[in-house]
């Protein structure tokens, strides 16, 4: 396996929302997230649990664009990669809030079966390592 890229997750609220520094600041609020198997949603749930707070309803949404639109309209909050927000041309209706590193810093890995490290997988690995300029985490005999 190798790290494909690192992401920064941020909490987003409507632009009028006060600063968020801990889970209690948004306790009981509606959150928009992907299904419960989403690792980003799990980070959000861990942040609440470890902060001793409880979110309100968690509404499942199937796209970042819909999630951001709901947040911009003041319907709730969401967690999203900062790179997704960088693609949005008008961010004036949302506000971003940093998360502590253990919740906000994530790595996405390219993994492959030990018996299936094909030339195509190697080419993908090399392309990702070159594009994101990160050293390989392990050799081609990975998991």
Language-model features, listed with the residues they occupy:
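Short beta-strand-centered segments that line the small-molecule binding cleft or hinge
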Residues: 1-9, 13, 22, 72, ...
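A late-sequence structural motif
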Residues: 21, 95-138
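Hydrophobic hinge/microswitch elements
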Residues: 37-95
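Well-formed, non-transmembrane alpha-helical positions, independent of function
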Residues: 3, 24-25, 47, 69
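Short beta-strand/turn micro-motifs composed of small residues
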Residues: 13, 33-35, 61, 112-114
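Short secondary-structure boundary segments
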Residues: 15, 81-84, 108, 114
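Secondary-structure junction motif
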Residues: 30-51, 118-122, 135-139
